[in-house]
Structure formats: structure tokens, C-alpha cells
């Protein structure tokens, strides 16, 4: 089916199958559509709300066109959020990735520049001295040797440049805001995925099943695309093609409720100071608790099932300052 027919289908309010969506997004990524066509397509998908098939197709096209990452045969994870929750918190998932790796897990973190916050994963890592533009081979070497690497979305998904001007002009959430966490070019074994809106938990979970994720958590924490300590966290656990929905509270992690305000970050430079202090064992207790809760759930994917024990282990590890050594090693690649 030609692009125009697929677009016409969207304009008339009909949804696309996975294969149709893959074909249309292939055309977008390969630069075959005009900006006007891309804008119309994104708005049509937004007004009706993209369904699981359409998101799955978009993910498939993104991965088919991505720069190849030499995938290891050992289990590894990603911890990543959609961004766009508008809360301007410190970089919790970036810190959690470094801490988990320092504790022995393997994490290939996929990330980008800031969407809506002042400081996205690549912004803060660059400020910390990490080269986010390493080659896939160098990133793989870091994953092998120190347990963590960063995959900069713009480097692996260069076809997204065709969409960038349209997204900038539209200034609204589109399907591209929700693709990021699902299109890690390393194709991780495990995923901890944060979403900016509660209604995305189910959509994401169903998409993870369609993408045949081995074991994933999708979380939305009372307005955050992370595990929350200021309220409840809605969770979908995807394992062997099945989805289980449940809620986690701070008590489930053995932690007290704390204000969202205590996690406010700022520009990359400010967030860098917070993360450096945290990884050195000199950070704010609220920051340590938030990172401990998120890292605890990430470690559960690796078979460490006791969340409260995981939190205690993470807090002890943070206090030791060893996580900072992992960050220092990451800056050498």
C-alpha cells in the first residue's frame, strides 16, 4: 500500500495494522514524506490515540533502521523514561543505571537530550564528562568491562532527524515521545520503562508483549515517569507474554513518603552536582531514597526479588562511594 493510502486511512479515523504502521514509519525515517505529511500523520495519530499495533509498527521500523549495536549474549537491562512528565526532577534513571552497574548488574542505557525537563540523560552525562558519542563498539566494551554504557538516541536513530523540525513546530506530545524507551538499539533482555501519563501504562505493557519482551516493568509514579516516593506507583509487569498490574507504595520499599519537591533538579550543571554528591555517598537523603527505590525495582529484573532488601543494599552501596568510581570509569571511554 502506498504512503498516500496509509495516510488517507489515518485521516479518515481508521487505525493501521502493525505491518502498515511499519511501512509508514519506514517511509518517515527514510525521508520519503514531506514535513506537511509528517505533521498531518502525527496529529491524526494523536487525536485518535495511537494503539498497540501502531506503536509496535513504529518501534519495528525504528529498530530496523537503527545503527547496529553488537548485542552481548549475557542478560542486560535498560532503565529509561519517556520524559515529558514536566516535573524537572534530578536524573533518577541515569543515576540508577550507574548504581546498578556498580552493584554488578549490566545496563545499556538508551537516552536523549532533554524533551521537556531542563536536563535530559545525555545533557547531564555530558556535563559529568561522559562521551555520549562513543562508537557502538566502544559502548559495548564499556558494558562488558564496567557494566554500563550509554546509547545516545540521535546517534543510533539518525532517521529521526526528518521528524525533528515537525516535532519542534508542533510543540505537543506525539507518538515519538513514547517511542524512545522502546527503541533501544541494543535490544535489552530486561526493561524498566517509565511513562509520563497513567493511561500509557496499559498501552506500553501491551506493546511490550507484542514486542516479545522477556521481562519488563512499566511504571507511572503519581505524575512521574519513575517509581515515586511522594505517592503510589502504578506498575505493569510483563513476563513470558503475560501482564500483571499492581500498585507499589513507598512502604513496599521500606521507605517513608517524601515530597516531590525534594527531587527538583535544574540545569545540567546543577543536576551534575546533585548526582556527583549522590554517587560519592554525600548526597541528599531524599535523592538517595528515590534512586534506591528505582534501582531496587531494576534489580528485581535480575532475580533480586526482595525490594526492601534491595533498597538497603543500594543505600549501603551509595554510602560507600563506589558508584562514583563506576562513573569515573565511564568517562574514560
Swiss-Prot record:
Mg(2+) 2 binds at residues 225-226. Keywords: Amino-acid biosynthesis, Aromatic amino acid biosynthesis, Glycosyltransferase, Magnesium, Metal-binding, Transferase, Tryptophan biosynthesis. Pfam families: Glycos_trans_3N, Glycos_transf_3. SUPFAM superfamilies: Nucleoside phosphorylase/phosphoribosyltransferase catalytic domain, Nucleoside phosphorylase/phosphoribosyltransferase N-terminal domain. One of its GO terms (molecular function) is anthranilate phosphoribosyltransferase activity. InterPro entries: Anthranilate_Pribosyl_Tfrase, Glycosyl_Trfase_fam3, Glycosyl_Trfase_fam3_N_dom, Glycosyl_Trfase_fam3_N_dom_sf, Nuc_phospho_transferase. The keyword Magnesium applies. Anthranilate 1 binds at residues 81, 112. Anthranilate 2 binds at residue 167. Its EC number is 2.4.2.18. It catalyses: N-(5-phospho-beta-D-ribosyl)anthranilate + diphosphate = 5-phospho-alpha-D-ribose 1-diphosphate + anthranilate. GO terms for biological process: L-tryptophan biosynthetic process. 5-phospho-alpha-D-ribose 1-diphosphate binds at residues 81, 84-85, 89, 91-94, 109-117, 121. GO terms for cellular component: cytosol. Mg(2+) 1 binds at residues 93, 226. Its cofactor is Mg(2+). Binds 2 magnesium ions per monomer. Belongs to the anthranilate phosphoribosyltransferase family. Homodimer. Catalyzes the transfer of the phosphoribosyl group of 5-phosphorylribose-1-pyrophosphate (PRPP) to anthranilate to yield N-(5'-phosphoribosyl)-anthranilate (PRA). NCBIfam families: trpD. This is Anthranilate phosphoribosyltransferase. It comes from Haemophilus influenzae (strain 86-028NP). The lineage of its organism: Bacteria, Pseudomonadati, Pseudomonadota, Gammaproteobacteria, Pasteurellales.
Amino acid at each position: 500500500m502506498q504512503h498516500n493510502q496509509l495516510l488517507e486511512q489515518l485521516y479518515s479515523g481508521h487505525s493501521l495494522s502493525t505491518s502498515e504502521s511499519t511501512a509508514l514509519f519506514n517511509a518517515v525515517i527514510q525521508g520519503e514524506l514531506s514535513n506537511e505529511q509528517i505533521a498531518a500523520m502525527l496529529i491524526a495519530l494523536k487525536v485518535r490515540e495511537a494503539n498497540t499495533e501502531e506503536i509496535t509498527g513504529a518501534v519495528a521500523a525504528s529498530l530496523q533502521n537503527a545503527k547496529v549495536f553488537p548485542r552481548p549474549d549475557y542478560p542486560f537491562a535498560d532503565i529509561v523514561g519517556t520524559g515529558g512528565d514536566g516535573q524537572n526532577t534530578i536524573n533518577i534513571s541515569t543515576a540508577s543505571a550507574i548504581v546498578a552497574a556498580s552493584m554488578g548488574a549490566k545496563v545499556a542505557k538508551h537516552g536523549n537530550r532533554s524533551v521537556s525537563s531542563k536536563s535530559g540523560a545525555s545533557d547531564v552525562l555530558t556535563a559529568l564528562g561522559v562521551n555520549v558519542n562513543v562508537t557502538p563498539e566502544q559502548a559495548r566494551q564499556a558494558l562488558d568491562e564496567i557494566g554500563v554504557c550509554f546509547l545516545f538516541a540521535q546517534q543510533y536513530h539518525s532517521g529521526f532527524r526528518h521528524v525533528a523540525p515537525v516535532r519542534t513546530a508542533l510543540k505537543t506530545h506525539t507518538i515519538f515521545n513514547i517511542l524512545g524507551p522502546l527503541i533501544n538499539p541494543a535490544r535489552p533482555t530486561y526493561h524498566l520503562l517509565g511513562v509520563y501519563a497513567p493511561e500509557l501504562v496499559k498501552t506500553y505493557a501491551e506493546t511490550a508483549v507484542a514486542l516479545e519482551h522477556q521481562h519488563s516493568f512499566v511504571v507511572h509514579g503519581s505524575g512521574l515517569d519513575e517509581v515515586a516516593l511522594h505517592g503510589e506507583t502504578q506498575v505493569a509487569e510483563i513476563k513470558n507474554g503475560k501482564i500483571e498490574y499492581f500498585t507499589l507504595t513507598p512502604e513496599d520499599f521500606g521507605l517513608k513518603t517524601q515530597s516531590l519537591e525534594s527531587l527538583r533538579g535544574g540545569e545540567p550543571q546543577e543536576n551534575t552536582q546533585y548526582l556527583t554528591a549522590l554517587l560519592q555517598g554525600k548526597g541528599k537523603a531524599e535523592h538517595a531514597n528515590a534512586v534506591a527505590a528505582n534501582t531496587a525495582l531494576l534489580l528485581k529484573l535480575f532475580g533480586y526479588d526482595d525490594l526492601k532488601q534491595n533498597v538497603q543494599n543500594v543505600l549501603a552501596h551509595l554510602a560507600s562511594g563506589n558508584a562514583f568510581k563506576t562513573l569515573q570509569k565511564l568517562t574514560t571511554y
